[in-house]
Design a protein with these regions (language model features):
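Small-residue-rich hydrophobic transmembrane alpha-helices
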Residues: 48-108, 145-159, 163-164, 262, ...
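Structural signal for membrane-spanning alpha-helices in multi-pass inner-membrane proteins
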Residues: 110, 153, 179, 183, ...
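Transmembrane helical elements of multi-pass membrane transporters/channels
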Residues: 17-36, 137, 171, 204-208, ...
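Short runs within selected transmembrane alpha-helices of multi-pass transporters and secretion channels
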Residues: 69, 138-156, 164-172, 197-212, ...
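Residue-level signal for short hydrophobic patches within transmembrane helices
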Residues: 8, 12-31, 35, 57-64, ...
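Short alpha-helical transmembrane segments in multi-pass integral membrane proteins
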Residues: 1-19, 76-143, 189-245, 301-366, ...
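Helix-terminus/linker motif at the lipid-water interface of multi-pass membrane proteins
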Residues: 27, 31-49, 118-125, 181-192, ...
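Hydrophobic transmembrane alpha-helices of multi-pass small-molecule transporters
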Residues: 60-63, 107, 175-180, 209-213, ...
């Protein structure tokens, strides 16, 4: 990444070139999650249940690692934009060291917490045993994972999006290959069942990290990791956490929302819980291109902000907003025209499909306007304004949608929950625009 490339290349092709690798990476990761679940489901239903119960804690650990990584990436991009390579290198070194420490703490904490956590959700001794066996191995690799994600965000911070794309693909593809070999004992490998799935996940992370280490050694970067930068810089650490903590909470909030809405919908019918689950599976793919664009925008907007290119910062924001808006408009059209086919991909129950069609058509009314809050969150994180980004996410996932869902469901029944989605998106867009205007001056 050089000054000419980041400061002078036309904004649209620049963001597109940064975003496309991210979109591909996220698609590969989504495919991996589906394939991994498929292989575990072949072991037994209890194994799949155990995997599902462990997932929230895995998601929590990943949220911490990725959220802090966003803070690393933001500081690197801003410092490089300001021409301060020394501070950028110090941010990368501090971030990597702290990420490794987070991994050690997560290993200890998650392994200790898991038995008690599983007991909260099931009394089946076999499921608990499978969950403990799987999670213990997975969390032994936590330091590898946090270090891995730290390198990923360092590469993103300097604009090496293709490197992170290839790295993620190396990890995911190796995991997909190893899953059947280690789970079922193909060839020279012993059959290890659910432990095999956990080892495959860990080895995928190892291969990913090895790839990043090789690239770091052979490819010159504008930041260097060095022991001389390890002396604690309290102000820099505070800046890393000022984005990292809100970033982690932003990633964890959707899980909190789903849990709350599941409890609300279960009072009406279990089929509504199924519909919500299907919607979030679909949402992953519908929002994926927009999320990739926002990820690609983060280092670009941070770099230009650090360089004092304020007019270009505004242009980057608006181009990203328009790109996200077009994608969400396409998603809206798809949900309005073929909702039955979308629901039919995940269930064959006619009643669930009929109710799901209505749900999709109501929820998608908020897709287009949601591009405002999605873009604002990414821009604010890229500018190092983590707290402002968290305020937008809190409005979107808790403060507005939950009261709206409770009030509307008491009047309209379960359908009221679906209306709460677009209402929350519309009101949050107003909050996001107001905050963006104050911070960015859009």
């Amino acid at each position: 990444m050089n000054d000419t490339f980041m400061k002078e290349k036309p904004v649209f092709p620049l963001i597109l070139s940064m975003a496309l690798p991210m979109v591909i990476s996220m698609l590969v990761n989504s495919l991996y999650n589906i394939v991994d679940s498929f292989f575990v489901a072949q072991i037994s239903e209890n194994a799949m249940t155990a995997l599902s119960l462990v997932y929230p804690i895995q998601n929590f650990a990943n949220a911490i690692a990725i959220g802090f990584g966003i803070g690393i990436s933001a500081q690197i991009a801003i410092c490089l934009g300001a021409g301060n390579k020394e501070t950028a290198s110090k941010a990368a070194t501090h971030g990597l060291a702290l990420s490794a420490l987070h991994g050690v703490l997560l290993t200890i904490g998650c392994i200790l917490v898991m038995p008690g956590f599983l007991v909260l959700f099931t009394s089946d001794a076999d499921v608990i045993d499978l969950g403990i066996r799987y999670s213990t191995i997975v969390f032994l690799f936590a330091t590898i994972n946090t270090t891995n994600l730290s390198y990923e965000k360092i590469f993103q911070g300097v604009g090496k999006m293709k490197v992170t794309m290839i790295g993620l693909m190396v990890g995911c593809v190796s995991n997909i290959i190893l899953d059947p070999l280690l789970i079922f004992g193909i060839g020279p490998f012993p059959a290890m069942g659910i432990e095999g799935a956990a080892i495959a996940t860990g080895l995928g992370q190892v291969f990913n990290l090895v790839f990043y280490l090789i690239v770091y050694k052979i490819q010159p970067l504008q930041v260097r990791l060095s022991r001389k930068y390890l002396h604690p810089d309290k102000a820099l650490i505070a800046r890393l956490y000022s984005v990292g903590i809100p970033g982690a909470l932003n990633l964890a909030l959707p899980s909190v929302l789903v849990s709350a809405l599941n409890g609300l919908l279960a009072a009406y019918s279990q089929s509504y819980v199924v519909i919500l689950g299907i919607y979030y599976k679909l949402q992953t793919f519908l929002y994926l291109p927009a999320s990739g664009i926002v990820q690609g925008m983060r280092p670009v907007i941070g770099y230009n902000y650090g360089a004092g290119e304020h007019k270009r910062v505004k242009k980057i924001y608006y181009v990203t907003l328009c790109m996200s808006g077009v994608i969400m408009l396409v998603g809206t059209i798809i949900c309005l025209t073929v909702p039955g086919q979308l629901m039919g991909m995940f269930t064959t129950n006619p009643e669930t499909i009929a109710a799901g069609k209505m749900a999709l058509r109501i929820i998608c009314a908020g897709f287009l306007v949601s591009s405002v809050s999605v873009t604002a969150c990414g821009a604010l994180e890229g500018l190092g304004r983590g707290t402002a980004s968290l305020v937008v996410s809190l409005c979107r996932y808790l403060i507005i949608i939950l009261p709206a869902a409770f009030i509307l469901s008491s009047v309209l029944g379960a359908v009221g929950v679906w209306h709460a989605f677009w209402i929350a998106e519309a009101l949050t867009a107003g909050v996001a625009f107001f905050i963006s205007q104050k911070v960015i001056g859009v």
